[in-house]
Each structure stands twice: as structure tokens, then as C-alpha cells.
């Protein structure tokens, strides 16, 4: 349900009534549910949308003249006032002739129908999305390292067995040859270097085309259908950028940024430079046609069966554009999910959430100490009504120092944190094999990055049993499928991080990848648990006796408890 809370008040002592009126954006018919006063001028209620898509709702309040009149009469009678001729005459005007008890019956209906001095809020909007927008496990892979679409299709049963809900593919389009990057981001590519998939566009086509090395259009369609049959949705990357060989460079030169001398300006995000990519110019005089073309790209893939999009750097494009595009796409395909790759300022991250993005990458990757995690999670809890995080433990661009130096225990700890803190989380291929060698000591880039070369991949990493078990736990424990029920638990030291999800699950993780750690986890009385209660570790099968108050834990490097409370 959509929960409603509002402050509703006016001068004087009149009794008020309030409702929430709501409808699908496509409909003109309003539905209605009452709001109830909860004290101190606060009102609350809810409504249950019946379909996916955008909904409009408005809060309406008015003076209930009938209830106000009856309340005044009752208070005067209670005070012993017997001469109520004037009040009775007023009541007869409102209710018609009759006794006081009859007036009370009439008032109950009239107070809803007669909306005296009615006022309304501005019309508000809510996006109603399917469960995958809130809860899901993501796996990212480069299809060229798996034998193209046919090879990826063969991996689907194993991905489904491991408990993944979404398979995210970096761009699958033709790759430009002009200024192509070589191995490890070399400025000059060798003849057999495949280039970066984010350098989109070549003689074979642009954003609506498929790289021929990955397979045919039929191969792609079969992959999407096979994924859906296995319960694994295919997510595509939507990157608004073009290689120098993209067809749009010739067809629409006015869509691109140029220097004063007229030369094209390649993309930069200092200190990073992308000589193989040109950005589109959202200030172009032909912006309307540009918007339409980009919208049509998404609609093209929607019509091919794709309903999930990871959007590359949306914070560097026009916010009104995104609001328009998402609304237009969802008008035809309301189940479409947009995942923002927006590592940026909080105001922009939350704005993208409010204008339609289903979920977002976060700064989780860089929060590794107890203090960092606590501060970060409290921030996200404040955003919970409108912002859904997706905790990726790594990406092709991000190999954090904690993983580089911490080894397998660090990978285990971060996996447990991501999978049990956030309803949506993800891993990029290689994480399960503990891949952790950077291109340089001070870099977060992988050496021999898959962005610039083809690897031979298979689902055979030693971390996969833990991945599978965590995904099983997530599916069987509903409290892990929500974020707003997170409660951080106190510990005495700095190396054990603990938290509860509702009153059903408690988690403790050793953040130290080098040393075993002992600590005390404090279960607060506010959780309302018994003085003593059993807990069952869903990872190890061990049972313990815990209590409200202090509880001892001892964990190996990177180790964790995922406790089922009361089991």
C-alpha cells in the first residue's frame, strides 16, 4: 500500500474530515479512502494501487458542519445547559426536523457528502513497480567472454540455481574502431583488441544494433526468452554515448559537443579520459529529435522483451529528459525498471529516484569500517521512502583496496553485508573467484580489465556456495527483502558490525579480514524480544541462546552470523 501522512488543521474548533483520492494516471476516475486523525493535527491512511504504473493522488479535507454542530450540542448538554432553542433551530436547518438521536444518524452520512470549505493538496504522484524493482540478486558478465549469447544461454540454468534474478549485460552493440582502446586502456589498440563495449556504434549500426561477434538477433531473442523461463531477467546497459564511428555522427552532427574550432570533443571525467567516446549534447538546438531518438532506443529493446535497464551515468544528462523518457516508456511498458549508475552528490541521487529511477548504485563499495557503514546506512534509511539502493560489491570499474588487500575473507564479509543489508545487491563476474589484482598499486581498476579484452569465464568460483546459500536465505526470509526495517545494533569494538532486520533476523560480520574478533552484540529492549530467546545461524546450522542485552560473538576473519531469531 501507499502510506499517507499529513498535517491537517484550521483555526477554531471545527471538526475536520479528510480523504485521499487516487487514480491511475491513464484514468479520469478518482477512487477514495478515508484518512484518520492520530493526534496533534496529524492524519494518516493508505491506498492500494491495483496496477503497475504511475498513480496520481491528492489529499482533500473539509469542515464537517454536522459533526461540529452535534459536538457543540453534546458539550452544552454535558455542561447542564438546557435552553438550546437557538442551536436546535440551526440543527433543523442542517438536518431537517427531528430529535437529537435522529440528527446524529443523519450527520454520519451528511458529513462525508457535504464538503464544506473543502481544500485540496497539490496532486502528487507515485510510481507503482513490480517486486524486482525492490528485491533481486544481480550478476554482471561480458557476453563476449562466455561465447556470445549462445554461451550465456547455457549458463542460465546455473545462474538460476545460484539464486540470481537479473543478468546484466554491458553494451551489446557494435564497437567503434576509431581511437579504439587497447589492453589495460592503452591508447593504441592492436589489430585483435576487441575494444570497450561502451564505445558504441560502428558500420553495423548503433544503439539498436547487436555486435555480430555476440550472435544474431534471433540468438538474442532466444536468450531473453530463455532467461525469463528460468526466472532470470536480462538487463541491458543504456549508455548515452557514441564512438566516432556511430551512424549518428553522420546523420545528426548537430547532436554532439564541439570545441570552438568545430572539432568534436571526446568524453572526459577527470582524471579519466575517453578518447574513444563522444558525448551527446543535450543543449543541442535539435534536442527534441535527440530525446525522441533515445526514447526510441529503449522502446526498441522493450519490444524485444527487455524490461530492465542499467543506465550509465544518468546524472550527467538532463534530469527533465529522464523524467520524460521514463514516463513515456512506462506508459507503454509499465513493468520497466531503470537502474541508475549514479555515483554523485546526494541531491542528484535522490532527485533521480524521485523522478522515476527504480534503484541506484550507492557508495557502499567505499564504506568498509564500522563507522563508515553506520553513517552511510543511517543516511539511506532517511531516503527509504523514495530511494532504493542496490549494493554491488564490485564493478568492472571498481576494485576497492579493501578487497585487494583483504583477500577471500574480505570478499566473504562484503558479500554477506551486501546480501543481507540491501534487498537488491549484485556481483560482477570474477568476484566469486576472488579476483583482486589492480592495474597499479593506487588504482581501483582491474589489471587486464575485461572492459578491453576477452576472457574465458565459467561459473566455478569457490565463493559460489556462499552466494547460493545467501540467495536462498534472502528468498525464504521476507524481512531481508525490505530496507526500511534495518536497525543497527551496538557492538563494543570497531571490527564487528551488527544489525537486525525486523525482529526475525540478526546479523554480525567481522570486518577484519586478517584477524579473528570477539565482541558483544547488544539487542535493545526496544525490539520487544523476550528476555531470552534461541537463535539459529542460517549459514552454519549452529544454535545459540541470546538475550535482550549483551550477547557474545566470536568470528573468524571475514566471518559472519546470519541468525534466525526464535528458531
Q: What annotation goes with each model-predicted range?
A:
Residues 194-225, 229-232, 242-459, 482-483, ...:
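Alpha-amylase-like alpha-glycosidases and glucanotransferases acting on alpha-linked glucans and related
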Amino acid at each position: 500500500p501507499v502510506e499517507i501522512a499529513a498535517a491537517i488543521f484550521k483555526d477554531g474548533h471545527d471538526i475536520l474530515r479528510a480523504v485521499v483520492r487516487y487514480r491511475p494516471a491513464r484514468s479520469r476516475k478518482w477512487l477514495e479512502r478515508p484518512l484518520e486523525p492520530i493526534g496533534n493535527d496529524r492524519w494518516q491512511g493508505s491506498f492500494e494501487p491495483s496496477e503497475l504504473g504511475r498513480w496520481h493522488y491528492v489529499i482533500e479535507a473539509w469542515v464537517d458542519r454536522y459533526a461540529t454542530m452535534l459536538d457543540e450540542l453534546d458539550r452544552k448538554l454535558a455542561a447542564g445547559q438546557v435552553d438550546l432553542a437557538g442551536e436546535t433551530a440551526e440543527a433543523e436547518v442542517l438536518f431537517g426536523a427531528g430529535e437529537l438521536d435522529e440528527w446524529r444518524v443523519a450527520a454520519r452520512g451528511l458529513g462525508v457528502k457535504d464538503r464544506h470549505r473543502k481544500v485540496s493538496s497539490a496532486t502528487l504522484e507515485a510510481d507503482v513497480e513490480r517486486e524486482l524493482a525492490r528485491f533481486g540478486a544481480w550478476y554482471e558478465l561480458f557476453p563476449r567472454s562466455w561465447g556470445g549469447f549462445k554461451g550465456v544461454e547455457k549458463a542460465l540454468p546455473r545462474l538460476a540455481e545460484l539464486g540470481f534474478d537479473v543478468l546484466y549485460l554491458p553494451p551489446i552493440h557494435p564497437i567503434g574502431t576509431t581511437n579504439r582502446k587497447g589492453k589495460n586502456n592503452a591508447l593504441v589498440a592492436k589489430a585483435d583488441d576487441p575494444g570497450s563495449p561502451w564505445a558504441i556504434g560502428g558500420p553495423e549500426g548503433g544503439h539498436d544494433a547487436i555486435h555480430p561477434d555476440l550472435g544474431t538477433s534471433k540468438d538474442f531473442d532466444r536468450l531473453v526468452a530463455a532467461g525469463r523461463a528460468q526466472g532470470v531477467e536480462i538487463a541491458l546497459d543504456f549508455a548515452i554515448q557514441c564512438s566516432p564511428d556511430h551512424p549518428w555522427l553522420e546523420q545528426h552532427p548537430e547532436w554532439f559537443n564541439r570545441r570552438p574550432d568545430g572539432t568534436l570533443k571526446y568524453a572526459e571525467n577527470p582524471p579519466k579520459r575517453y578518447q574513444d567516446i563522444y558525448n551527446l549534447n543535450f543543449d543541442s538546438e535539435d534536442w527534441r529529435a535527440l530525446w525522441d531518438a533515445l526514447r526510441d532506443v529503449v522502446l526498441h529493446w522493450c519490444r524485444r522483451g527487455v524490461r530492465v535497464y542499467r543506465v550509465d551515468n544518468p546524472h550527467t544528462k538532463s534530469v527533465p529528459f529522464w523524467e520524460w523518457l521514463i514516463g513515456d516508456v512506462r506508459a507503454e511498458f509499465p513493468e520497466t525498471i531503470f537502474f541508475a549508475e549514479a555515483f554523485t552528490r546526494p541531491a542528484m541521487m535522490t532527485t533521480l529516484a524521485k523522478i522515476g529511477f527504480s534503484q541506484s548504485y550507492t557508495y557502499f563499495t567505499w564504506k568498509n569500517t564500522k563507522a563508515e557503514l553506520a553513517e552511510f546506512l543511517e543516511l539511506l534509511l532517511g531516503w527509504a521512502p523514495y530511494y532504493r539502493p542496490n549494493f554491488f560489491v564490485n564493478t568492472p570499474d571498481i576494485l576497492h583496496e579493501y578487497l585487494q588487500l583483504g583477500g577471500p575473507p574480505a570478499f566473504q564479509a562484503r558479500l554477506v553485508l551486501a546480501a543481507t543489508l540491501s534487498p537488491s545487491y549484485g556481483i560482477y563476474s570474477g568476484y566469486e573467484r576472488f579476483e583482486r589484482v589492480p592495474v597499479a598499486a593506487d588504482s581501483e581498476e582491474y589489471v587486464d580489465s575485461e572492459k578491453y579484452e576477452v576472457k574465458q569465464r565459467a561459473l566455478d568460483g569457490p565463493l559460489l556456495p556462499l552466494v547460493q546459500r545467501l540467495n536462498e536465505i534472502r528468498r525464504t526470509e521476507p524481512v531481508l527483502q525490505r530496507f526500511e526495517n534495518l536497525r543497527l545494533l551496538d557492538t563494543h569494538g570497531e571490527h564487528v558490525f551488527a544489525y537486525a532486520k525486523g525482529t526475525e533476523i540478526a546479523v554480525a560480520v567481522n570486518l577484519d579480514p586478517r584477524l579473528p574478533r570477539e565482541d558483544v552484540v547488544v539487542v535493545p529492549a526496544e525490539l520487544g524480544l523476550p528476555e531470552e530467546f534461541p537463535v539459529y545461524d542460517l549459514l552454519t546450522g549452529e544454535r545459540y541462546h541470546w538475550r535482550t542485552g549483551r550477547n557474545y560473538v566470536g568470528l573468524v576473519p571475514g566471518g559472519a552470523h546470519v541468525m534466525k531469531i526464535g528458531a
